[in-house]
Amino acid sequence: MNVSKYVAIFSFVFIQLISVGKVFANADEWMTTFRENIAQTWQQPEHYDLYIPAITWHARFAYDKEKTDRYNERPWGGGFGLSRWDEKGNWHGLYAMAFKDSWNKWEPIAGYGWESTWRPLADENFHLGLGFTAGVTARDNWNYIPLPVLLPLASVGYGPVTFQMTYIPGTYNNGNVYFAWMRFQF
């Protein structure tokens, strides 16, 4: 192998190492922002929120009919949260909720949610959101062992009332659940 090939390989590896360093620096910056947003939402909430679970829907393409026929898709429950809107108009929330899961057993969840918010109409009360939630849940069929969750969020709302939703991905006969709730801001 001639010298130019060694230089090319060394240069390629060196550039990759520099890139990895930048990725970790950005990850550290992102985590700092994440922690600061949680702290600010906890310390300076603008609203108190009431959460009312509305629907759980198991994707029919991903389940046997005999399973979906047995599942609960009316998730009785409720929750409470703190929230705020940041200077960009994005929503931040801390919440705790408990609801009846697919097996009609209680499932608690608590976490932080963030949504980038758009107000596409002249009426500023109408808003759409897209973001994520990070938290912890526990299920009866997992012996209530705390499980971390990182899920997408989407919403449509008017004024203090928001219909918020997520999708829990999964495999055949497991996961693939649409879950939605109403959020009322006070």
Curated annotation (Swiss-Prot):
GO biological process: lipid A biosynthetic process
Main subcellular location of this protein, as a coarse class: membrane
The EC number(s) this enzyme carries: 2.3.1.251
InterPro entries in the record: LipidA_acyl_PagP, OMP/PagP_b-brl
Signal peptide span: 1-25
Sites marked Role in the phospholipid gating: 172
An example Gene Ontology CC term for this record: cell outer membrane
Active site: 58, 101, 102
UniProt effect for mutating residue 101 to A: Drastically reduces palmitoyltransferase activity while leaving expression and membrane insertion intact
Gene3D superfamilies (UniProt xref): 2.40.160.20
Annotated site, Role in lipopolysaccharide recognition, chain positions: 67
GO molecular function, one term: O-palmitoyltransferase activity
Physiological role: Transfers a palmitate residue from the sn-1 position of a phospholipid to the N-linked hydroxymyristate on the proximal unit of lipid A or its precursors. Phosphatidylglycerol (PtdGro), phosphatidylethanolamine (PtdEtn), phosphatidylserine (PtdSer) and phosphatidic acid (Ptd-OH) are all effective acyl donors.
Additional detail: Overproduction leads to camphor resistance and chromosome condensation.
The protein's assembly and partners: Homodimer.
HAMAP family: PagP_transferase (MF_00837)
Protein name: Lipid A palmitoyltransferase PagP
Organism: Escherichia coli (strain K12)
Organismal lineage: Bacteria, Pseudomonadati, Pseudomonadota, Gammaproteobacteria, Enterobacterales
